[in-house]
C-alpha cells in the first residue's frame, strides 16, 4: 500500500511539481545526510496537499451528482422540497397541529337538509364524526330514512354497520336522517342539540 502511494505521489510530482533546475542547485543538501535534497521533500509535501485537495473536490463532485440524481427522480416533487428557516418551520408545524382534532361545540344532529361539518353556535352543523361512549362505536347516519318502530337493541348489535342488513329496518322519509350505533338509534328532521337528549351518549369524535 505504501509503495503504491509513493508511486502515485511520484507521478503527481512529475506532472504538477517539477522543480526548477536553477533552484535545485541552491537548496541541495549533502549526500551524506540520507541522499536527495530539501527541495524534493518540500515538493513531496506539496504534492500530498494537492492530492488531498483533489480528493476533496472529487468527493464534492460526487455529492453534487447524488443530489442532482435525487432531484431528477420521476416521483420527486420539487414543489414540496423547500428549505425553511427554523422560525417559519415551527410556525407551520404549530398551525398544522392546531388544524387537527377540532370538536363540535355544541354537538348537533339534524335532518338530511341540515349540512354536516364542525358545529358551533355561530355555524350550527350536524356532526358527522359522532362516537358513542357507551358501546365505543362510530355512529352511522342515513339521509332521507327513518328507523322502523320494530327496531330493538339486538338488531343494531348484530347488524351494525352493514347497510345491506340495516336497510331491512329503514323506511324512506324525505328530509329525515337516521342515526345509529350498536346500542342506540334515533331519526331526526330538525337541528337538535345532543345536550337536550340525555338518553344518547354520543359525542363528537373530532374532525
From Swiss-Prot:
Record keywords, A-Z: Cytoplasm
Keyword Mitochondrion carried by entry: no
TM segment ranges: none
Recorded GO CC terms: cytoplasm; cytosol; photoreceptor inner segment
Major place of residence: cytoplasm
Source organism: Bos taurus
Superkingdom to which the source organism belongs: Eukaryota
Cross-referenced InterPro entries: CFAP418 (IPR029239)
Subcellular location: Cytoplasm; Photoreceptor inner segment
Function field: May be involved in photoreceptor outer segment disk morphogenesis.
Keyword Cytoplasm included in the entry's annotation: yes
Subunit structure: Interacts (via N-terminus) with FAM161A (via central region); the interaction is direct.
Tissue spec: Expressed in the retina (at protein level).
PANTHER family, A to Z: CILIA- AND FLAGELLA-ASSOCIATED PROTEIN 418, PROTEIN C8ORF37
GO BP annotations listed: photoreceptor cell morphogenesis
Region ranges (Required for interaction with FAM161A): 1-75
UniProt name for this protein: Cilia- and flagella-associated protein 418
